[in-house]
Amino acid sequence: QSAKSSISEDIAIIKKTFEKQGVGIIRTVPGAAGGVIFVPKIKREQALAAAEKLKEQMNDASRLLPGGYIYLSDLLAKPDVLHDLGKMIASAYEDKKIDAVMTVATKGVPIAQTVANYLNVPFVIVRRDSKITEGSTVSINYVSGSSSRVEKMELSKRTLASGSNVLIVDDFLKAGGTINGMRSLIQEFDSTTAGAVVFCESGVSNHNVTDYSSIIK
């Protein structure tokens, strides 16, 4: 059985090394129920380099799709891309006491799941059509920013606890209607939105959403 002083010294060495290399930070929680928590982090220069690499991969006219969308499926299927995105977003919100990560089906799921994994919190999936296996749901109507149509999104009542601090994560922002819809849905659960982050956004200048971050613009 190791002495407490020896363990403390080892933790101090690991903490210093991780912070120096930009791997993450080590937090200690005192008390009988405490312990050691590892929080992934990424240095600013590493994040900028990863974002620039992604931007280069996306700088291809063949990715442009009808309706102003961008083809992202191949990138979001790569573990290294998800690793970088997840770490960048989680690093920005690791001190915001996030309770859950929310996204809308389906393309945003891999990113949201990776972010939730790094933050060690649940992730919830909002759907436009509920499944019978989800039980009772809460639904809201929202205005699609790109088409100005009224659409619906739903979330299982058991998925999100009241009073949660929720981080919204999605793959693409066109006009902002989907993010606004998720914010309204979060309010229906008596919860708050900690922030909204998207992988990339369209070149449209008149987005209908504010207070969001984009990895690639």
PLM features: what roles do these ranges have?
Residues S5-E9:
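Key DNA-contact positions within bacterial/archaeal DNA-binding proteins
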Residues D10-I11, F18:
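DNA major-groove recognition helix of helix-turn-helix
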